[in-house]
């Protein structure tokens, strides 16, 4: 469980997510009970060029559960959407890859994270990355905006995951790619005692699904070539692990 202090409580899972990740944005030096920062990203296979190009401030609030960039190349000139972008580490990497002629939209429900992501992108020299506060279920972007949608440890935090995937499908262009890292639940391990409260929802525990369930939801949303690409070993509880998923919008 997180080490978020006692004022980080709420009866609503979404509000609990906002409170916890505001705390992470404002106090990244605190111990939250799960791995974060540059060394965690290195463990997950992030390229050394990216790790060195971005300052420690960009990485300090990054709680990556996997490496979505390992699932396929992001090309120069493309448009990428990062849902649940947090402090913007992945969005900054995407901005590196798409270059000045590309575009990156970072979406997060936490105003403190959006502000920090904007500061990080500006300080890193990525004007092509812009950030907006919004819910994953109501992305403020037109149909067919993106060549790729990435996400890292965020979709499990949504209560209505079907609605999230429908929105992702909507904003992708035909042939667009979904490349995500997220937390999943091991079906063979019983739930931890901590897994029933909203705090563990914000800690990427209670909202997790089994991999097969999530794959079925991707197919239901209309995606093809749906694939569980592997597990990352990231843990938020004894019965969860990071996983990598990819899929294509047909067309």
Give residue ranges: language-model regions.
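A short acidic, Gly/Pro-enriched loop at the edge of an enzyme's catalytic core
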Residues: 76, 137-148
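Conserved SAM-binding strand-loop segment of SAM-dependent methyltransferases
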Residues: 124-138
């Amino acid at each position: 469980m997180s080490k978020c202090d006692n004022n980080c409580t709420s009866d609503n899972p979404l509000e609990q997510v906002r409170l916890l990740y505001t705390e992470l944005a404002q106090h990244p030096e605190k111990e939250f009970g799960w791995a974060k920062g540059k060394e965690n990203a290195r463990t997950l296979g992030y390229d050394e060029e990216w790790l060195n190009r971005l300052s420690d401030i960009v990485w300090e609030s990054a709680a990556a559960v996997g490496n979505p960039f390992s699932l396929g190349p992001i090309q120069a000139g493309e448009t990428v959407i990062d849902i649940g972008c947090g402090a913007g580490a992945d969005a900054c990497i995407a901005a590196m890859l798409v270059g000045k002629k590309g575009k990156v939209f970072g979406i997060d429900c936490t105003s403190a994270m959006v502000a920090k992501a904007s500061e990080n992108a500006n300080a890193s020299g990525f004007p092509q990355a812009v950030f907006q506060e919004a819910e994953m279920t109501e992305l403020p972007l037109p149909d067919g905006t993106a060549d790729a949608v990435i996400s890292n440890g965020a979709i499990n935090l949504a209560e209505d995951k079907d609605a999230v995937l429908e929105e992702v499908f909507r904003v992708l262009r035909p042939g667009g790619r979904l490349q995500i890292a997220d937390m999943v639940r091991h079906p063979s391990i019983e739930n931890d005692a901590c897994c029933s409260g909203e705090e563990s929802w914000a800690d990427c525990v209670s909202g997790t699904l089994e991999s097969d369930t999530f794959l079925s939801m991707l197919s239901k949303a209309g995606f093809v070539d749906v694939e569980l690409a592997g597990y990352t070993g990231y843990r938020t509880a004894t019965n969860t692990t990071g996983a990598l998923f990819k899929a294509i919008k047909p067309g």
